């Protein structure tokens, strides 16, 4: 499985923050530089390169682009430092990658959100500390209606239901995740409610 211990030199050199702002611990470089380094890592182990890319581009980048300062301090800074691993969960068993066909939903409950649904093929799903989750907040709105949440893995109602075994890239874990009445704080919303 992808684990941060495999890339200790990358952590030491700050490579998990190549394209992130220096004020969050990043190096402030461009995506081309990040891609070159990912390509070089992929020459030795494509699975680990995939895990790193999932963490940086799918788990951390949405927070850098759309997160509040508090979310950036809580998730982005430790993700760049290698203290947390992030993941992204959009794909679902009966929807594939068609985001409009997802069933996962989040319903407001006072100052909280109640998240229910199943996600699959989630890279870093086993080893992550948090997941960026797409869920319907307004099923009636066919144009928008999907909001994004940062979900801590240790919340009650969040379960890694299974690790998906695959033929290649075995060092990159892929999982199915289940959210059953998972109560999220109001500040779990990433960006604006759709």
Please report, for each region that a protein language model flagged, where it lies by residue.
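A short core secondary-structure module
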Residues: 112, 116-160
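A short, Trp-centered hydrophobic/proline-enriched beta-strand micro-motif
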Residues: 82-90
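A glycine-rich, basic-preceded beta-loop-alpha segment at the flavin cofactor/substrate interface
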Residues: 33, 153-164, 173-194
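A structural signal for short hydrophobic beta-strand segments in well-ordered beta-sheet cores
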Residues: 104-107
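Short Gly/Pro-enriched turn/cap motifs at secondary-structure boundaries
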Residues: 79, 94-97, 121-124, 137-140, ...
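Short Ser/Thr-interspersed hydrophobic loop/turn segments at strand-loop and sheet-helix junctions
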Residues: 14, 38-42, 135, 151-156, ...
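Structural signature of FAD isoalloxazine-binding scaffolds in flavoprotein oxidoreductases
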Residues: 28-38, 98-102, 178, 184
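Internal helix-loop-helix
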Residues: 12-83, 123-130
